[in-house]
């Protein structure tokens, strides 16, 4: 019997999108419950908190066979380990996590710029090129389509999600980073990812 999986988040990409990409890549069926899709998001979220456990009073929340999982980064790591896309050795698991942590750093800076209009010039002229250079160098060193080892890990999906997000606001951000651009094109054309993106609804963030 297949386990029942429900992902709870707002009607947006945000902190849930990497989780959705992991499920898409793996071909795992789940219910994508979005607050605000058919009504008031905050009223729906308030009612949800009355019904379900929310350890930190926030989403995303993942429910698998009546177990509640909270915190987006912890969920990503758990799923990656469970479904064997976390790296095929202890060292590769470390490298994947290292890259994932780097993605969180620059994604945080992008969100401050995109959502809160903070330091846009600094982000575009300094932070984005700097971090893109870091990722470009890692790809160059690994010398293949993947960031870690010779197979896909959640680090690849995390970097793809980062630039998929950034390029909705700042197109051509990867024009000076050929390996990173090729990587994103490679991930976007994986059959399950391509199908997910082509059917993904538009969202404000």
Swiss-Prot record:
What is this enzyme's catalytic activity, as reactions?
RX + glutathione = an S-substituted glutathione + a halide anion + H(+)
Query: What's in the keyword line of the UniProt record?
Result: Transferase
As one GO molecular function, the record gives:
glutathione transferase activity
EC numbers for this chain: 2.5.1.18
Q: Which residues form the GST N-terminal domain?
A: 3-87
Residues covered by the GST C-terminal domain: 89-205
Listed transmembrane segments? none
Function (record text): Conjugation of reduced glutathione to a wide number of exogenous and endogenous hydrophobic electrophiles. May also function as a storage protein or ligandin for parasitotoxic ferriprotoporphyrin IX (hemin).
Name of the protein in its database record: Glutathione S-transferase
